[in-house]
């Protein structure tokens, strides 16, 4: 944290060759007001300092006009994307800046999961040619076991953002594989299910999984 006790303000330090910090909150937890910043040459700084303000958080409220309608997010991005983004933003009890770009990024991840299993060029919904009933090779098995262990541990510790990050790594790895074992995909969907239940359930069914993936 940047040490700004003299001004009663804290933020995350950014080392980019000069003095810069992301000023988010005052020490008492209240928002940083506009009169505590100043404009210089197109940039915003903490008044009287060389600390550059790269982001400033405001609580959502109707009076500020910055309320996000969850129904609109679900309509445009899907319920899984909204759920996953809220979990990916960090500790649930922490105050976090809302970003629609972030929601879009999470939706892109879910789309990659879909393309990892489904043939996106087919006229109907069918498994892609890479899905096989062969066993995992050594690298695939290691990646699968590491992912199961990491996601399980992080989920139990409620470190949801790092669990999601590990699932992203899994998806990137297996997307590059010419063969994607069906059982590895099903194991991954079990991990994904608490985070993106609708997508996980649909893909589980398409892979021939028995019953409900959440059970």
What do these predicted ranges mean?
Residues 71-215:
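Helix-rich, typically C-terminal accessory recognition domains appended to large enzymatic cores
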Residues 1-59:
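Glycine-rich (often Gly-Gly/Gly-Pro-rich) flexible segments and glycine-rich loop motifs
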Residues 2-7, 45-79, 93-104:
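Conserved phosphate-binding loops in nucleotide/dinucleotide-binding enzymes
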